[in-house]
Regions:
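Hydrophobic faces of transmembrane alpha-helices in multi-pass small-molecule transporters and flippases
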Residues: 4-32, 37, 60, 64, ...
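Helix-terminus/linker motif at the lipid-water interface of multi-pass membrane proteins
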Residues: 27-57, 64, 82, 120-130, ...
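Short alpha-helical transmembrane segments in multi-pass integral membrane proteins
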Residues: 1-17, 80-146, 188-229
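Hydrophobic alpha-helical transmembrane segments of integral membrane proteins
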Residues: 9-11, 49, 60, 64, ...
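N-terminal membrane-sensor/transducer module of prokaryotic signaling receptors
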Residues: 41, 160, 167-169, 187-188, ...
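Small-residue-rich hydrophobic transmembrane alpha-helices
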Residues: 54-112, 116-118, 150-172
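Hydrophobic alpha-helical transmembrane segments in multi-pass membrane proteins
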Residues: 19-35, 70, 74, 102-111, ...
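Small-residue-rich segments of transmembrane alpha-helices in multi-pass membrane proteins
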Residues: 176-180
């Protein structure tokens, strides 16, 4: 008779918990964001419908970019985990650098596309009024301004999870959506109106980027020290 072992279940659950919590966090942020856009959009020239529609489109575009980074991360996790368990820390560090480099290159390509071709990207999802494209293009260029740095956060979250640091992996997965973005999209519109939502994005991205770098450098430094010893 198959009898589950609690210690094994905890280990298995911890590996997927970061992704699970991140998906829940994204849903919560989207709900809050839609309500903020509806409220502040009604007090702007755009009305409430245009901002919500535009943000929905741009969220889909961002999901394409994030799906690629998450795919690279998931493909790298067995490599990180196996070599970390074998104490081959040089390979762990090398694999992490390759993953970050790959995601950064992809992120940079998306960044330039967002900045140079916002009208064409938004137009893929349909037509709209002049105000619709005006808001969508501006939102895409401002909110996604830090796209070139956005690949490091999901890579770092997956990295920490794969080497047995599930709690830190969960924290890293929550940095952008919950710890930084959620408070900013609530606070900024109080002073800047609907524009506050746009500027909350790159600031949250920058903060999550810095935090990911700090924690990753610390852990990679420990591995380097362990190799010397």
């Amino acid at each position: 008779m198959l009898k589950p072992k609690l210690s094994y279940l905890k280990a298995i659950i911890s590996l997927g918990l970061a992704s699970c919590i991140n998906q829940i966090a994204m849903a919560i942020v989207q709900i809050v964001l839609n309500n903020i856009l509806r409220y502040y959009g009604a007090n702007s020239v755009y009305g409430s419908d245009i901002p919500i529609a535009c943000v929905g489109v741009i969220s889909k575009v961002n999901q394409v970019f994030m799906a690629i980074c998450i795919g690279i991360t998931q493909g790298s996790q067995p490599i990180w985990g196996f070599n970390y368990g074998a104490k081959k820390y040089d390979r762990v560090r090398q694999a992490y650098r390759y993953s970050v480099t790959a995601c950064t290159v992809i992120a940079t390509i998306f960044f330039f596309c967002f900045q140079i071709f916002p009208h064409q990207i938004v137009g893929i999802f349909g037509t709209g009024s002049e105000l619709y494209f005006q808001f969508a293009e501006r939102y895409l260029k401002i909110f996604m301004f830090m796209t070139f740095a956005n690949g490091i956060q999901p890579v770092s979250s997956g990295f920490f999870t794969s080497i047995g640091m599930a709690k830190l992996g969960i924290v890293m997965s929550l940095t952008r959506q919950v710890i930084f973005l959620l408070p900013l999209i609530i606070i900024f519109p109080l002073f800047m109106g609907i524009d506050g939502v746009m500027y909350a994005g790159p600031i949250a991205d920058a903060a999550a980027f810095v935090l990911a770098i700090v924690f990753a450098r610390r852990e990679l430094g420990k591995m380097r020290s362990a190799e010397i010893v």
